[in-house]
Amino acid sequence: VLDETFPIENGVIETYSDEECIVKKAEEFVGKLRAKCCGKCVFCREGLVQIHEGLKDLTAGKAKITDIDLMKELADIMRQQSNCSLGQTAAGMMLGLQEYFADDIKEHLAGRCHTLTCKALVHYYIDPKMCKGDGHCVENCPKKAIDGGKDFVGVIDEFECDKCGK
């Protein structure tokens, strides 16, 4: 209802708690802008694609510092050259993210997300001190991504695990 009353590109300030990942929220925000893009303005159309993909890479642990530099350069150009508010809004958001949340970006570049929101950056393991070696974890894993059994500490297969937390 709020998105219909107050479109996301109108300057309304959104607040987030410390438990929400600002990088993930930025990726979702740019995704919404990308979906609304009419495609007429080259800088908006192509810039939204590049920034959205860059933020997706960042939340997936695939981005490099050079990607962040490229997104900043692109955002600077988008702010000047976009003919509509969508491109200018995305540019402002990206520049603001880099200016005010640089630590969050660095954290994601290092493969961590302190909110545990970005699943690709969360790594599960079975604590040997807590494991009783009774196979309980093996039975409870819906993806059968845990190898173990009686008198063995379970080991999680990162490729099979969908990070459900069960």
Where do the model's predicted regions map?
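Ferredoxin-like iron-sulfur electron-transfer modules
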Residues: 29-35, 76, 113-133, 144-166
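The C-terminal cap of the DNA-recognition helix in HTH/winged-HTH DNA-binding domains
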Residues: 80, 142-143
